[in-house]
Amino acid sequence: MMAALYPSTDLSGASSSSLPSSPSSSSPNEVMALKDVREVKEENTLNEKLFLLACDKGDYYMVKKILEENSSGDLNINCVDVLGRNAVTITIENENLDILQLLLDYGCQKLMERIQNPEYSTTMDVAPVILAAHRNNYEILTMLLKQDVSLPKPHAVGCECTLCSAKNKKDSLRHSRFRLDIYRCLASPALIMLTEEDPILRAFELSADLKELSLVEVEFRNDYEELARQCKMFAKDLLAQARNSRELEVILNHTSSDEPLDKRGLLEERMNLSRLKLAIKYNQKEFVSQSNCQQFLNTVWFGQMSGYRRKPTCKKIMTVLTVGIFWPVLSLCYLIAPKSQFGRIIHTPFMKFIIHGASYFTFLLLLNLYSLVYNEDKKNTMGPALERIDYLLILWIIGMIWSDIKRLWYEGLEDFLEESRNQLSFVMNSLYLATFALKVVAHNKFHDFADRKDWDAFHPTLVAEGLFAFANVLSYLRLFFMYTTSSILGPLQISMGQMLQDFGKFLGMFLLVLFSFTIGLTQLYDKGYTPKEQKDCVGIFCEQQSNDTFHSFIGTCFALFWYIFSLAHVAIFVTRFSYGEELQSFVGAVIVGTYNVVVVIVLTKLLVAMLHKSFQLIANHEDKEWKFARAKLWLSYFDDKCTLPPPFNIIPSPKTICYMISSLSKWICSHTSKGKVKRQNSLKEWRNLKQKRDENYQKVMCCLVHRYLTSMRQKMQSTDQATVENLNELRQDLSKFRNEIRDLLGFRTSKYAMFYPRN
């Protein structure tokens, strides 16, 4: 069979006379001539080829011998191979530390510059330090950074400087790829640890920049998102190297030079958790949900109530109920003696959470009581006076508004509005303020009695009742944020929030479809609409039928919207019509039928798929998402800005009065000579404490970096799978062993026989 397929080939090898002796002896149709059209003219000498080959194969002794014999300068150390790689680049790709150190010792600093022929390189504009950072090789980067290397600072995507404009005009792809290479280098954990005094802060900033770049340069979105994820994981892994609570306290309380510093808190050695707040601001969910960080947060959260976690469930419930019932007494005790032992217990975040929750439940109880004590005799009063319960509600609302104002003052407008809990609170309080303001206006302006059906549609009392009803709905919905503390209900609450965001995206598509079909149906049925006064209507627009719904834009919108829930029964294709209305009725039926297919079948199922995807995404990372959301809630109770709940927070406390008197006395004394000296001493003490904290932070950070490197090496060595790093390390060891044996025996292997004679 093989002989039949290849008649010119003798499988037995006995005869080869049937083979063609040369292409010229065969027919042109049987032989295809091959020619290398990619041939690159090589300008390297034999010694330069040998030099590059020795660097590629890891032949330390041959590279050393060539460099020692290059006293006359015949060898061009800057030579490159056909791929545009010089000796340093080849060595870094092979991760050969010995040869790299040898090249640097022999003055190859010029090779640290950019490759001269990037057209033949797999990565454009790659300097050796960039290549080493891409490979995340700590040892090679350590050697290269001793040569005073530098990297070009990447410009913003929308930068319109002369340099960026010229590069974009010349080659936009090359410019974008160059920016990606630079950021891939900057995101290297090894480079961050070597060049940054605060690696965690740098990882936060880089992840935020990369996330922003992924939204702008959508062509490289996956690459930038992967780099951002790499930075987040690096910050998390670095924090995981902490061994005790003292190190965690130093890391999480560190304040960078750009952040505002609480001088009083620094002198009193209070926990500000600045780094943790910064992690939440940069949306570092991996960092915040890390086990060490969560353990430290639990310790701070319970404070002097640490024994609560070890109590049985029944005792936990009794503790919460006792605090919830006697919260007014506890608030008064803290108001009178905030620095006492009892006051310190109330000041713990856990106790503040229970007391604030009990205060809010009391507010909801007053709202329910408001509807029960409604006076039926004042039902038709156009301007009723405020009741006692109204004044109680106003006290609570003023307290909640004051709490929001303090939080807005200390956090800033941007950070305040980022929290959906604050947004809901702002809207709720605004509605309550508008409600009681309208009630006061109605009481002062209207004193008559009349049936409600005779009132103006926008009467202040009616508007106030509508706003009050909507505010009540938001008040109860605000309880959803308390679910965050539960490990069971918390993930569900987070999933609901994500689903609402996806539903907002879906509305953008649904409203366009609804508007399109509404315009079509309104245009179709509006022209022949018969007013209701004419009872002798016939055909499609007869009021005995329901087709007159489509005579207005609003009516059509309502009808099509309720079609989704099968609550609109509009007979479009009717049986009783005149001959002239047959086409019009058929077109209406087609439009509504198409609407049912597009919205009821397609878009509704799309919404279900989107919501399922959102829920599954949260469920896959349930632990991380819940711990991050819980940490955000806990942090709002860690400071001492809002210890007392409404309405006790509107009462000036002795602590506030003492702070005001102390600040006033310091301001007065600062204008005297003695006060100026005291102020200088205080500033000096503050600077010394800040310097001491920075030194402690650097010591702890050095320990974390060394532990991180050790864990990475151990992880690489203990892995059971054959990774690229393991194979490269094995290749280097075998190459070193081969070269040492060859040098000891005094000869070269056959691979180098074409370059060296044997000794």
From Swiss-Prot:
It comes from Oryctolagus cuniculus (Rabbit). GO terms for molecular function: inositol 1,4,5 trisphosphate binding; store-operated calcium channel activity. GO terms for cellular component: cation channel complex; plasma membrane. Residues 1-30 are annotated as: Disordered. It is found in: Cell membrane. InterPro entries: Ankyrin_rpt (IPR002110), Ankyrin_rpt-contain_sf (IPR036770), Ion_trans_dom (IPR005821), TRP_dom (IPR013555), TRPC1_channel (IPR005457), TRPC_channel (IPR002153). Belongs to the transient receptor (TC 1.A.4) family. STrpC subfamily. TRPC1 sub-subfamily. The keyword Transmembrane helix applies. Disulfide bonds: none annotated. Residues 15-28 have a biased composition (Low complexity). Forms a receptor-activated non-selective calcium permeant cation channel. Probably is operated by a phosphatidylinositol second messenger system activated by receptor tyrosine kinases or G-protein coupled receptors. Also activated by intracellular calcium store depletion. Its main location: membrane. Residues 374-381, 483-505, 574-582 are extracellular. The chain crosses the membrane at residues 353-373, 382-402, 462-482, 506-526, 553-573, 583-603. Activation of PRKCA induces phosphorylation of TRPC1 and subsequent Ca2+ entry into cells. It is a multi-pass membrane protein. This is Short transient receptor potential channel 1. It catalyses: Ca(2+)(in) = Ca(2+)(out). ANK repeats lie at residues 46-75, 83-112, 124-153. Homotetramer and heterotetramer with TRPC4 and/or TRPC5. Interacts with TRPC4 and TRPC5. Interacts with ITPR3. Interacts with MX1 and RNF24. Interacts with FKBP4. Interacts with TRPC4AP. Interacts with PLSCR1. Interacts with PKD2L2. Forms a heterotetramer with PKD2 with a 2:2 stoichiometry; has distinct channel properties separate from PKD2 or TRPC1 homomers alone. GO terms for biological process: regulation of cytosolic calcium ion concentration. It comes from the Eukaryota. Keywords: ANK repeat, Calcium, Calcium channel, Calcium transport, Cell membrane, Ion channel, Ion transport, Membrane, Phosphoprotein, Repeat, Transmembrane, Transmembrane helix, Transport. Residues 1-352, 403-461, 527-552, 604-759 are cytoplasmic. Pfam families: Ank_2, Ion_trans, TRP_2.
